[in-house]
């Protein structure tokens, strides 16, 4: 009862907002899940806050799962195969979270034929390509999405206006490659790159708000026998947030971010058809950069003597 898996074919049959299918908004329709605000992709699970949910994309942590200050999620529906929500009794392999685990899996691509899908919405368009690299053995999937809010607003702003350089947009890029070496070995690589960019440009004053996520996953699947299966995974996750301001000969920037390097090995053992035993271990090198300020006034630079970064290492074993 605490775990629910949704396939994208069913999710796409639900009504959508502004032409965009949103996985996280769909999860808000499930029992025990409540929206954090009207039209917002953040959600509460059994009383826990949105920041207490562990959001994973092909096992890599996504620290900010929203675009446009949470109005859209970062997950392009055309690139997603399924999403699993664990609301209670989270397995030890996830490292523990107070509220829930959202595990999103990307499509692996068709290894037989080529396909192209896309869509044009009110504020964003998307395109997905997939097909075989070596027929029957390897495949690829590439997906891109970009909003054109900046292009929609541009006709309403005069080219001579002091706000002509202002605007907002976001984009997502998804990539997945997989190769089957044998009946017992398979390797895949997946990556996600997304960014939001808000720019306000006045006659004498300008400000920029860029922020975004990047994730990378490399995994080796090995089948020892019909009862024992192994996954070896290397993960990278990065989130950055910046605020930049400029006026005349003055420039100022605030930067903060989170970066993870992880590796994990897990085994699945099936002693019989009714039981499954899962065990393994994981290591994470975690870097947290609190808000760091830099700036220039004319030819004078202002910067901290030392950037205050926090480094942490985690070693986890589970069974």
Feature map (PLM): residue ranges:
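Strand-connecting loop/turn motifs
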Residues: 52, 78, 111-113, 133-137, ...
